[in-house]
Amino acid sequence: MKVHPYDQWAPDARALDLVGDKWTLLIVRDLVGGPRRFVELQRVLPGISTEQLRSRLNRMVADGLLTRQRYREVPPRVDYELTERARDLVPVLGALAHWGYRWAWGAPRRGEEVDVGAILRLAPGLLTPPAGLSGTVEMTVTERSKEPASRTYVLEARNGRVSIAEREAPDADAHLAGPESAWVRALGPDADRQSLELDGDARLAEALLDAFGAEAERAAGASAAA
């Protein structure tokens, strides 16, 4: 693999030398919520081979985008985590998602891998919550055909920003839950949330969902006006 594939003295080319390879930005996206082990990254990136993932992670560690933490456990455990350099890419992911909403968004295609968490993990770079909105929403996605059968995410809105973590939050201000198909309808172009179960602060939960929907709606409007 060539270390500097573009060999051009320009800041965008220098940036693409580091993050322009296939899978790199998706790995950053999938580590936004916190460190992951190798097998966890394999789960959320099913299209990448074991050797490709190992090579890409090694390169990202060498480039200062990731840290690798080894634990003395049986079996051995290695965690990968974003560095400050990589966290500065979160707004870049948000801008890329904005572009995708405007020009490439739609219902899942035949054969396309569906991972609701992949959309939720974009929240820190994508969403700008309404002024004064503050609180946490626990979001649970269930799909019996997958392992594990349910995944739980916590989105927190505070000071005009949104953060995400993959954990349970029994004391969250609001709880949203539903099967994967319900989340696809809720986060897709139709923004149909009727099949999601809501408990707690409805205003907060709906505002965060609206933030996803607003991006899609705003993008669709911009596309129609273009």
Regions found by a protein language model. Give the residues of each.
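N-terminal helix-turn-helix DNA-binding core of bacterial DNA-binding proteins
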Residues: 11-48, 58
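Key DNA-contact positions within bacterial/archaeal DNA-binding proteins
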Residues: 51
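Basic, amphipathic "hinge/linker" alpha-helix immediately C-terminal to the N-terminal HTH DNA-binding motif
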Residues: 20, 72-95
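Acidic, aliphatic-rich amphipathic alpha-helical segments
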Residues: 85-154, 203-226
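Low-complexity, glycine/alanine/valine/leucine- and proline-rich hydrophobic stretches
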Residues: 138-192
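C-terminal interaction segments
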Residues: 169-226
